[in-house]
Amino acid sequence: MKKTNLLFSGLLSSGLLFGSLAIVGCTDSKPDAETTNPETEMSTNIAWQDSQARFTVIADGVIRMEYDKDGQFCDNPSFIATLRQYPKANFTVKETEQMVLISTSKMCLSYKKGSGKFTADNLAIQAEASLSKSFTWHPGDTPQNNLGGTYRTLDGYDGSKYYSWDHNKPGQGQELPLEDGILTRDGWTLLDDSKGLLFDGDVNDLSSAELPWVKERKDDTIDWYFMAYGHDYKQALHDYTLFADRIPLPPRYVFGYWWSRYWSYSDAEMRQVVKDFQEYAIPLDVLVVDMDWHWVEPGKGGWTGYTWNDRLFPSPEKFLQYLKQNNLQITLNLHPADGIPAYEDKYGQLAEYLGMDPLSKETIPYDGSNPKFMRGWLDKILLPLQKQGVDFWWLDWQQQLNDNRIPALSNTWWLNYCIFDNQRRTQPEHRPMLYHRWGGMGNHRYQIGFSGDTYSTWASLAYQPYFNATASNVGYGYWSHDLGGHMFVNYNDKLDRELYTRWMQLGTYLPVMRSHSTKNANMQKEPWKLGSEFQPAVTASIRQRYKLAPYIYTTAREAYETGISLCRPLYYDYPEAEEAYDPEFRNQYMFGSQMLVAPITEPMVDGVSKVKIWLPEGLWFETATGTMLQGGQIVERRFLIDEYPVYVKAGSIIPTTGSDVKNLASCSDKVCLDIYPGNVESEGQYYEDNGNDRDYDKKYAVTTFKTKYEGKKQIINLGERKGSYNGMPARRSYSVKIYGVPAPTEVLLDGKSVDCTYIPEELVVLIELGEPDPECEHSLQITYPEGMPELNNGLVGQFRRMKNTMTQMKYRDAGINFCEGLGEMGSISEALLYFPEEFASRIQQFQDNYNQLPQLLDKQKLSPENKQFFLDDVLY
C-alpha cells in the first residue's frame, strides 16, 4: 500500500495521523444508539457535506465520496449506481474545527474540512476492529489482491488464450484480460465512478414507457464508492446491490435445458427436434434459433435481418404457436449493427417514424444513442416479432464496441439496458429477459450472459468453471456458455464425444445449461446421436438438471435477495483457507450453499478420470459413489464416464423435482426433499413463485424444512408454507428421499404409520407424503434398526460398478459362471430387497468379498487380461 507523508500542522491535535498504521480519532468508535433505524426506512444517508465535498453512508461497509469544485453533486443514477435511496444506515459524525470523522461499525473516514479535492493528504479511511482485515487507506492506494471479475466475451478463445480464425489478426496467443471485480483479499475496494455515464432520469420509475437516456458527466469531479468488508465477501456483494441494484430473478424456464445450434433449420426440422426430445424423454425448455430464421442471401438479408425466411418458415405464427403448445420458449438471434435496409418488411414504418422518405430506399443506420432511432427500432422492428410469439432476444453484437456519438458509451452495455428495460416498461405481464454479452459494471441487472464462440477443446472446458464462478465477483451470475464449444480448431475435426459429455455434466451445475455449435455437419450434439458409450451420460446430465430445478430456483431467489450468485468461488464460504485461492483448485466452486463441484477438465486415461480435489472443513458426501469424506484435506478421486465429482454438505436438505417433467412450465410439480447423511441438525428451504410474472418481489412462498437425530430416530419437520402468489397450487405433493440409510423399522407422519419404499442399489429410503396441508407444520419420524454397518463408505459406487462389470464380463466370456462370493456381489441389490432381515449380514458379506476381490478373481480362474480388466473397470 502506498505510503504518504505527514499531513499538516495541527494534525496531531485533531487526533488524526495520515500515512500511519492508525487513525487515532477513529479507533474503536461505535455508532450512537439513537442512529439505529429500521432497514425498511429509506434515506439518502448523507452524513456530511460542505460546498465542495459530500459523504454518503450507503451501509456500514460502503461510503460514497463526492467532490465537485462548484458543489454540484450528482443525484442522477449512473450506469453502475442506479439507486440513490438506501436503507437507513448506522453511523456517527464527529467534527472538530479542522476535521470531520464519519464512523460506522466497519470503518472510520477522516477528512480535513475545506481542503478541496481528495488527496492522500486530506482524506483517509481506517478499518474498525470488527473487520477480519485491518487497513488504512488513502487516495492513490491500490489493492494488491483483486480476485477478478469477468470479461465481455470468450469469442475466439481456446481456454484463456486468444486465437482468431483470422491468423493475421493481432493478439494471437494473448491471455484473456480478465477485468477486476469488486472483491479483494486486502479487505477493501474503491469503485471509481467519476467518469461513468449517467441516466437523465430514474431507471426504476416505470410509470412511463420512455427510457431514461444516457447523460455525460461534468469533467473534474470525483465520485468514489469505498467498500470495507474484510473477508466477508458475501456482505460486500450484498452491499454492492444496495447502490447498484439487485440481480433480477430470471423466469423459471431459464433453468431448464436450452437446445441451440447454428443451422439453417426449417419449421419441419425444428418440429422434429422437439419430437425427438419428447421421444427420448429428455426435458427441454428453450429453443434457440440462430440467424437463419431471417433472410441471409444478398439483396434480401445478411448478417443483420428482421424478416422471416418464408422458405424455411412458411408461417412463423403457426411455428411459434406449435412451440407454445409444447410449453417451449423461443429466442431469435439478432445482429443489429448493419442497420435496417430497405428490403426489410418493416422498413417503411420505421423510415416514416424517423422522418425519412421510404422511397429513398436508403439503409437506416444503427444509431443506438439516438433516442428516436432506439424507440423506433424497439417498437417498429422488434415488437411485431414479439407479438408473434418470440419470448426474448439473443443479442449477438460483435461489431463496433462504442457509440459513434458518445465514445464512452459501450454499444453492448447500452443495448442490454435498452432492450431489458424496455421490456420492464412495456411488458408488465412477464419478466424481462435478454441473452447477450457482458457490457461492463452494472450489467448484472440485465441477464442472461452469452459468452461467445469458444473452441471445442479441453482447454476451453478447463477455463470456463473459473471464468464462470469469478464473474460472481461483479454480480454477473448468469453466464450461458456454448456447452461442447462452438467450433473446432480445424474445421474438419470430429466431435470429441468424451469432451462433450464432460462439458454437459458440468452444464448441469452451471447457471444456464445450453448446447450450441457453429454450422458444421460434424458438430452433432443431439444426445441420441452420441452412441451407446456417451448418450446415457449426456441424457442423465439433462435429467439431473431438471431434478435439481427447485434447488437451483431457490438459490436464484437467494441471488436476488443477497447478491450472491448461484455459482460462487470457494473463498466466499472459506475466506481464511489458502486452498480457496490456490490456482490448482480455482475450478472448484460452490453450487448454491450446499453443493461443491470439482469439474473434470481432462480426458480419461484408460477409461478413468482422476481428479485432485480440495474439500473444505466438514463432512462431504460424494454423490457419485455414496462416500462420506472428511474435509480439511486434499483427496484424489476416480470417476467413470457416467460419474461426476459433486459433494454435498453432510445433513443437507435439497429440494428436488419429485417426478419426471418435460419442462419447467408448471407451478404444481411434485417436490422431493433429498436428505443427505450426517448426524447433524440442518435446515433447507423451498422457494416457489409464478415462474414468469413481475410480482416475484412480493408474491412468492417459502417452506422451511428441518432435520435432526435422536438416537436411532431421525425427525424431519415440514414447516408451514408462508406467502402466496398467482397460480399457487392449493396443495403440493411431497416425498422425502433419505440417502445412506438402512430400511427403517417404522415411519410415522404426524404420529400415524406410513409406508415407505427402500431402494437398495442407492441405499435410499423413499417416503411418499401425499399432499400435506401447507397451512400446518408436519413431523416425519423415521426409526432405523440397531447394529447396522457403515453404509456411506462408497458402497453405492461399488454396487453399481460391480454389477456393470459383471455384465460386461459375460460379453468377454459368454460361458462364464461366477463363483461363490463373486456371484453374490452382482446381485446384492436384489438380495437386500428380497431379504431385508439379512440387511446387515449381506452388507458385511459384500464388503468382505470386495476387500478380497483379487483373490476371488483368482478363484474364478480369469485370464490375466480379464482379471486386470475387471479390477480396472470397478476402479479397484
What are these regions (language model features)?
Residues 420, 441-449, 463-464, 471-481, ...:
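Catalytic core of carbohydrate-active enzymes
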Residues 650-876:
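C-terminal low-complexity, glycine/proline- and small-hydrophobic-enriched intrinsically disordered tails
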Residues 150, 283-538, 573-579, 585:
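Aromatic- and carboxylate-enriched substrate-binding clefts and catalytic-loop regions
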Residues 55, 63-65, 101-109, 596-599, ...:
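Short, well-ordered beta-strand segments enriched in hydrophobic/aromatic residues
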Residues 77-90, 354-357, 622-641, 746-770:
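Solvent-exposed beta-strand/loop surfaces of large extracellular or lumenal domains
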Residues 58-98:
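A low-complexity, Ser/Thr/Gly/Pro-enriched, surface-exposed linker/loop concept
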Residues 94-251, 261, 267, 274-279, ...:
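Catalytic and substrate-binding clefts that recognize carbohydrates or anionic sugar/phosphate headgroups
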Residues 24-25:
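C-terminal motif of bacterial Sec signal peptides marking the signal peptidase cleavage site
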